[in-house]
């Protein structure tokens, strides 16, 4: 069984995930998704009781993989059929747990959102970013932002502290969901999708007639963009990406480009004026820097 467990963990690592320290056969385990903080539980795995196979995945990226132990004797048709059946059962089990956690998170999000008051315009984060509240609320001193799907269902919340620290409500559905920043979702003529909420506020204030959606992070740009294209096939769609020029490979801009290609959208990246600091990365940074320069 040790070899099976070791090989199963190797398969999980090969998919870009770090498996939990202890895996008990027959039990569904949860662990952080790819690149997520230690408290995250988007990753999951289940090793079958006999150690001959298992499956795993990452709900934050949408991947699902299977693993089957190698042996000298080929698996029979009946064994292959049994393996396929057990994989489907494991996937359904993981899906049921995810749905239950997301339903619970949605209830908690609704309760917090309904009890929260409108955010004051003098919140330190708003002042530092030079943006308006745009419907944000306040909960325990943090800006509270709704995360919704395309049916307007509240799925989670994002909290932004005075110092800019960000946190998503645990267990909530994020993939394919977004923070509605501004604009009319009934019949939009132009949709702009960006990563962060502050960037979205800057874009909304610059283009007040556009529907602006914040995808929360670069990895969620493509799922949101594809859904926008599905909802409004002929809409003018713009992916306003971040430009992390100092990071090798510029992953944020790369993901923005991939989202634009997948959704047949325009790609917009900040155009940096001569002399602007290389530490600037997004449209909010650009807008703030221009204001500072213009005011001396």
Give, region by region, the residue ranges found by the protein language model.
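TOPRIM fold recognition
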Residues: 1-6, 189, 205-296
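Non-catalytic accessory segments of DNA primases and related replication-initiation nucleases
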Residues: 1-124, 244, 251
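Short aromatic/hydrophobic-glycine micro-motifs
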Residues: 14-17, 131, 265
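Short glycine-/small-residue-rich flexible loop motifs, especially phosphate/cofactor-binding loops
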Residues: 9, 123-126, 200, 257
């Amino acid at each position: 069984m040790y070899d099976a467990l070791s090989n199963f963990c190797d398969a999980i690592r090969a998919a870009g995930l770090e498996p939990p320290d202890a895996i008990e056969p027959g039990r569904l385990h949860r662990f952080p998704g790819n690149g997520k903080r230690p408290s995250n539980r988007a990753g999951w795995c289940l090793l079958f009781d006999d150690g001959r196979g298992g499956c795993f995945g990452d709900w934050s990226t949408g991947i699902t993989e299977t693993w089957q132990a190698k042996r000298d004797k080929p698996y029979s048709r009946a064994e292959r059929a049994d393996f396929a059946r057990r994989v489907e059962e494991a996937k359904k089990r993981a899906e049921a747990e995810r749905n239950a956690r997301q339903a619970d998170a949605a209830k908690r999000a609704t309760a917090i959102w309904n009890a929260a008051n409108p955010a004051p315009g003098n919140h330190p984060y708003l002042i530092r970013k030079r943006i308006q509240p745009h419907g944000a609320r306040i909960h325990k001193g943090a800006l509270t932002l709704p995360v919704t799907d395309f049916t307007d269902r509240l799925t989670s919340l994002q909290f932004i502290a005075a110092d800019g620290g960000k946190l998503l409500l645990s267990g909530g559905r994020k993939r394919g969901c977004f923070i509605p920043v501004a604009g009319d979702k009934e019949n939009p003529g132009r949709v702009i999708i960006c990563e962060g909420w502050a960037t979205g506020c800057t874009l909304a204030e610059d283009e007040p007639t556009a529907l602006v959606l914040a995808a929360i992070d670069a990895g969620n740009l493509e799922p949101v963009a594809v859904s926008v294209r599905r909802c409004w096939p002929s809409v003018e769609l713009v992916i306003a990406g971040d430009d992390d020029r100092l990071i090798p490979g510029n992953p944020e801009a790369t993901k923005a480009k991939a989202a634009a290609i997948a959704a047949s959208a325009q790609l917009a990246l900040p155009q940096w004026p001569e002399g602007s600091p290389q530490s600037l990365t997004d449209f909010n940074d650009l807008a703030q820097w221009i204001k500072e320069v213009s005011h001396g």
